[in-house]
């Protein structure tokens, strides 16, 4: 190959049309003739790219077809970069004005207007703006929601509650008026009387007489209740206690004397009748005997202690002598 002359003429292959030197064209023709007779399927690079990736074969095939339509070149997306750049510059300048106003104490500038991109699509139902891909999803959903709200589809449970099927309830003040009118009507019915000629005549109510009668009835009831309460005897039931009499020398007795008294003496007996002498003497003798026995035991214990101490002292003195 190094000895080949660059000025040597080349000849095209009659099968594939490529050009070769005369020496290599003979070798190429035999190989190219064999390949032309074979019918191999063309290699699809889209399937190889689709394996092990998030892309689908249909999306890759669609891109290849678009590329073939445009002469092997992908169409560049039309972007409104100039408009976006202008919006960005306006936002930066407005923020600088706010910072300057905060530092100097000047009044704050008005907020910048939010510019909607020109390629956005406005929804005719909610008047919001979306890009083309989002508008395709949003507009059908928004249309369905608005038709559902405007149609006023009532649920099956509320069909019975229509204006024709139920009577509207009265308001708060109307209910009070109806109650007062019904009461007045019942009172008027009671006071109506029939005359001799058959005509109905209503008797006039005297409010002052009614008030006096009610007061009298209340006074009589209160008097009856107070009289009954005074006439009741004091009982020892649960929750009530009889009034205790004043303390007198005769009532100040010992516990032993109170035990010998009758079980349920009345208040008059306690005040008038003194306690029997026999019981007092017996109780006094009992109390005296009890106190004398206690003093005897104390004296005996003291004497025993003294005698024991004396014996101990004698034993100690003898042990010292011997």
From Swiss-Prot:
Tagged with keyword Zinc: yes
Annotated Zn(2+) 2 binding sites: 123, 126, 138, 142
InterPro entries linked: ZC2HC1A/B-like (IPR026319), Znf_C2HC_C3H (IPR049899)
Low complexity bias (residue ranges): 278-294, 311-322
Biased composition (Basic and acidic residues): 171-219, 296-305
C2HC/C3H-type zinc finger segments: 9-38, 119-148
Composition skew (Polar residues), residue ranges: 148-168, 220-238
Keyword Metal-binding carried by entry: yes
Molecular-function GO terms, alphabetical: zinc ion binding
Cofactor(s) listed: Zn(2+)
Keywords noted in UniProt: Metal-binding, Repeat, Zinc, Zinc-finger
Similarity comment text for this entry: Belongs to the ZC2HC1 family.
Protein name (database record): Zinc finger C2HC domain-containing protein CBG14627
